[in-house]
């Protein structure tokens, strides 16, 4: 597991101390069906990588103000339960609106020259929701995609930390504009998945770029200034400076044909998880969350004492066991397209050489 940078150790400890105090308040607990479901949501939010790196993402998003960062993470834990993310992931792709899935509005493919996974946003394929049902189904698609994106953010493999967002404006037109959904997307992205974006490239030229710039003049204010600072506008010919040609779509003069992506993948199969499997898994999540909290408090109290190093190593080893337990939950779900293509193995290792 990752080591906390020496200059961030104290603020990470302060962040955990504040968060633990907050989530143990009766007023917070009552936001969940039960205290056990709180622990499950906490575990699923934080254990996908290294607990401390998860907290650091929230700290960085709030400029290392502990109270603001703790509140942000606490809100994300509540949101995760209220958004029924478990249900979305258990249903898998087949539980989503298939018109949205096959439209290839949002998908992950390849890595850039810094080793970051590439998240493609094909705005010309965006289908604006026509009613409340469409909006909810589109939200479910985005949440499903974002949860799968976390599989590519393992700090043991993704030393670059974050993804490259590649926004394709090749055939972008007025029919693809929906500022209401843009606001929903921005709020979800930056409030509940902070610091996942390493850089974003807006790729286009001519009239289509001019059209998008008009939208951007309004939409950019949905984003925090820190997120806006990561956005770069470029022409299709410049993308090769960031990404190898084999991962660049045909529309940007590359070799990757995204229209064939789902044709290559075997059909989705049902997940192996039964209700009783998830009940047992949740018990393990609850126990693990409680043990992480206990060990972290012990680590905080041991600061500067002879036993500090020993407790730190014990806690580090436990964080790794938690990551393996989190992957156990992933294995119960229907396999996503990247798993079906053999790009992600059972241990969570990503191998783009198989693309």
Curated annotation (Swiss-Prot):
One of its GO terms (biological process) is phospholipid transport. PROSITE patterns: CRAL_TRIO. InterPro entries: CRAL-TRIO_dom, CRAL-TRIO_dom_sf, CRAL/TRIO_N_dom, CRAL/TRIO_N_dom_sf, PITP/CRAL-TRIO. It holds the Pfam family CRAL_TRIO. One of its GO terms (molecular function) is phosphatidylinositol transfer activity. GO terms for cellular component: cell division site; cell tip; cytosol; nucleus. This is CRAL-TRIO domain-containing protein C365.01.
